[in-house]
Amino acid sequence: MANAIIEKAKERMTQSHQSLAREFGGIRAGRANASLLDRVHVEYYGVETPLNQIASITIPEARVLLVTPFDKSSLKDIERALNASDIGITPANDGSVIRLVIPALTEETRRDLAKEVKKVGENAKVAVRNIRRDAMDEAKKREKAKEITEDELKTLEKDIQKVTDDAVKHIDDMTANKEKELLEV
């Protein structure tokens, strides 16, 4: 019974970590990374389709992404979607593929992105703390309903806190690594 509360909290915290990793993947660090285009959706035959499902995305050079559509007729739609996206990179269409040259980041841009990383990391920690609160509330509810004893409640609260501390430490590590990656020249 008590383990179910902890397992549910762990699972939700893992989802927070995965979400944070996806968010960090979308923050460009001055080098090509296919995950920059994960959030780009293309209007393809009237349906919003993720870019990676209608084109292959390769990295021929350190700062170049190459988008090769599976269907050449979708090239203009892909270019339109890339222009409309918030990635901040202008696509170059050469008729059969689209090149995205990632510009070198200025010092100011690096600092701004580092601030963004901190903000995203802090939001992830808030989400983890909310998960902890939900788990603690569930444990207290079970103690009130006499499903667990007061001693079991104290042990459970300590276990939940340990899981939370581990999750927050993991988020701090992820944030520090992303900041380091951004601030490297």
Curated annotation (Swiss-Prot):
GO terms for cellular component: cytoplasm
Alphabetized Pfam families for the sequence: RRF
Family annotation (CDD domains): RRF
A GO molecular-function annotation: ribosomal large subunit binding
UniProt entry keywords in alphabetical sequence: Cytoplasm, Protein biosynthesis
Major localization class: cytoplasm
Domain of life: Bacteria
Keyword Protein biosynthesis found: yes
GO terms of biological process kind: translational termination
Subcellular location: Cytoplasm
Keyword Zinc included in the entry's annotation: no
HAMAP family for this protein: RRF (MF_00040)
Family statement drawn from the similarity comment of this UniProt entry: Belongs to the RRF family.
Biological role stated in the UniProt entry: Responsible for the release of ribosomes from messenger RNA at the termination of protein biosynthesis. May increase the efficiency of translation by recycling ribosomes from one round of translation to another.
Name used for this protein in its record: Ribosome-recycling factor
Source species: Streptococcus pneumoniae serotype 4 (strain ATCC BAA-334 / TIGR4)
